[in-house]
A protein has these predicted regions:
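N-terminal pre-Walker A segment at the start of P-loop NTPase domains
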Residues: 1-17
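Hydrophobic anchor at the beta1->P-loop junction of P-loop NTPases
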Residues: 25
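Conserved lysine of the Walker
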Residues: 33
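Hydrophobic positions on the alpha1 helix immediately C-terminal to the Walker A/P-loop
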Residues: 36, 40
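Short glycine-rich substrate-engagement loop in P-loop NTPases that contacts/grips substrate
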Residues: 55-90
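Structural recognition of the conserved hydrophobic beta-strand(s) that form the central parallel beta-sheet
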Residues: 93, 117-123, 147, 156
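Short regulatory helix/loop adjacent to the ATP-binding pocket of P-loop NTPases
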Residues: 109, 126-145, 157-163
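Interdomain hinge/linker elements that couple catalytic modules in large macromolecular machines
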Residues: 158-219
Length: 219
């Protein structure tokens, strides 16, 4: 389901910032990183090119001859035949960049080049898997980061179609320590109980909202 996420607005701020650098959206798996990055790119750029290193490992070959941006693009057209690269109008997504160390290193080249906005997702960045030392040349100073987690309580309320004015009223009451109405108290108490029971993972919330999904329903 298409949930409203705060990370989307943060990506808008990143895009509108002058001289922004490639951004890496980090976080646990299944929290919605890939979905929100793809949605943002498709809604804000004329063209989007996705390098999915997890499901298309052959794309790692695009970086086999170095980190020249034009050369990387030239190689990528061999494996992504429908890709369109237009300077300042194309967003490049590196999906699961932790699966391609060379792509991580190339971010410096893309940052210095400046013609393409690069967004990357990663679930295990900085983690030494199976005792193997990670030797990725991290381009210090040429990356920006966005930490993404499961839906927080406010995002959960959005997913439950809670009226925005009700959310603002309860936030104001909490800030000013003003008493809330009994109806508000009962409603938000119920929402808190649901949030504790369901959690903030997008798939779990989708299962609760959509009773037609072929999995058990929450009480």
């Amino acid at each position: 389901m298409d949930f409203k996420r705060k990370a989307y607005d943060q990506l808008i701020q990143w895009k509108n910032k002058k001289n922004h650098k490639p951004i890496i959206v980090k976080g646990l798996r299944q929290v919605g990183k890939s979905y929100i990055v793809s949605k943002f790119a498709k809604e804000n750029y004329e063209h989007v090119v996705i390098f999915d290193f997890r499901h298309q490992p052959i794309l790692r070959k695009c970086f086999s001859s170095g980190y020249d941006v034009d050369q990387i693009i030239s190689y990528s057209k061999v494996y992504l035949s429908d890709s369109v690269f237009v300077p300042y109008k194309t967003a490049i997504i590196f999906e699961e960049i932790n699966d391609c160390e060379e792509a991580r290193t190339s971010l410096k080249a893309f940052a210095l080049d400046g013609r393409y906005d690069v967004l990357a997702t990663g679930s295990l960045l900085g983690v030494n898997r199976y005792g193997r030392e990670k030797k990725t040349a991290i381009p210090t100073g040429y990356e920006e980061y966005l930490e993404m987690s499961s839906l927080d309580f406010e995002e959960f309320l959005w997913a439950m179609n809670t009226p925005l004015d009700a959310i603002e009223n309860i936030k104001k009451s909490l800030t000013t320590l003003q008493e809330i109405t009994p109806s508000y108290h009962e409603y938000f108490k119920e929402m808190i109980i649901r949030y504790i029971a369901i959690g903030g993972m997008p798939d779990a919330i989708s299962a609760f909202i959509n009773p037609n999904l072929p999995i058990f329903r929450y009480a």
